Regions:
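Cell-envelope/ECM-targeting effectors and their regulatory/trafficking segments
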Residues: 1-48
Length: 48
């Protein structure tokens, strides 16, 4: 488990959980596709 990855996962879920269509990221501290998809979805929200 990576503490920085876990911190990012928690941040993603806190910031974007109220956005329609955002899939919650598992908070396990592991890198992987769900985390990458969460980062992409967050970026898309920010870019409009």
């Amino acid at each position: 488990m990576d503490e920085m990855v876990l911190s990012t996962q928690k941040w993603l879920n806190k910031k974007y959980s109220n956005v329609t269509g955002f899939d919650k990221v598992p908070e396990n501290g592991r890198t992987g596709w769900p985390t990458i998809y969460g980062l992409i979805e967050g970026l898309q929200v920010e870019l409009g």
